[in-house]
């Protein structure tokens, strides 16, 4: 199985890099895992709706350029479906069981994802109504993917 996270912007925080590296190392026993960063669009502090759409569209083009046709795409979005860790684990297992070998998660920029990205997605996942930095979501998502594999293995990691 191949699992990819496509995310907007460069990760600078060392503590987040260290956490992600640890979970990526653990995930290597279960899947090929990679994170692809696409550049974020520079934007002033206050944007009109049209300017926000333009920023999301430009970032969306960069994201979609990294997505292959055969990939099952899950976008992280506030409007997405919230799942318990066990449900998330079952969905990953079911995708693998029924022939999906490439899963791509998308974390948009600070303004979210474009309509084109949302339309390309096969599913939308939400971690709740909280607003979290998209850089932090990389670590949270990577840990949850690892947790899903551990749940599917029957490991005591998930208590």
Curated annotation (Swiss-Prot):
EC numbers: 2.1.1.177
Enzyme class: transferase
Keyword terms, alphabetized: Cytoplasm, Methyltransferase, rRNA processing, S-adenosyl-L-methionine, Transferase
Listed GO MF terms: rRNA (pseudouridine-N3-)-methyltransferase activity
GO cellular component: cytoplasm
Keyword presence, Thylakoid: no
Catalytic activity: pseudouridine(1915) in 23S rRNA + S-adenosyl-L-methionine = N(3)-methylpseudouridine(1915) in 23S rRNA + S-adenosyl-L-homocysteine + H(+)
Primary subcellular site in the record, as a coarse category: cytoplasm
KW S-adenosyl-L-methionine (keyword) present: yes
Binding residues annotated for S-adenosyl-L-methionine, in chain numbering: 76, 108, 127-132
Subcellular location: Cytoplasm
One Pfam family of this chain: SPOUT_MTase
Subunit annotation: Homodimer.
Functional summary from the UniProt entry: Specifically methylates the pseudouridine at position 1915 (m3Psi1915) in 23S rRNA.
Family: Belongs to the RNA methyltransferase RlmH family.
Entries under PANTHER family matching the protein: METHYLTRANSFERASE, RIBOSOMAL RNA LARGE SUBUNIT METHYLTRANSFERASE H
Protein name: Ribosomal RNA large subunit methyltransferase H
Organism: Latilactobacillus sakei subsp. sakei (strain 23K) (Lactobacillus sakei subsp. sakei)
